[in-house]
Amino acid sequence: MQKRLVRKLELEMLLSQIEPHPSPTPSLEQYTIPAEVAATMLYIAAYANDDIADKTVLDLGCGTGRLSLGAAFLNAEQVVGVDIDKSAVRLAFKNSVRLNLRERVQWIAADIDVVQGSFDTVLQ
């Protein structure tokens, strides 16, 4: 069964609904990627490079989940989002519930060295 092609604007609209970090920590280099930029990055990864759909995706420094949730929306087989900031991961979880993508992403609040396994695609 062929999966439907997601329009870039549809992806951008979804990503714009993700709640940003309320108080980013400069020492952790936290910033919110604009929805338009994130959609472009993910769209290229998904459709130009075939690196998202049916792939295992790791999002290092996932923050509030913008790239992780976008990858899940673009039909990644499995998505793991990792961030050392527990409050960011809590917000990523809330975002995934609100966008009905909770079952598509595993969230880990820890340093990246705890991640085990292999992944087809790494986002950061």
Residue spans for each PLM region:
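Class I S-adenosyl-L-methionine-dependent methyltransferase catalytic core
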Residues: M1-Q124
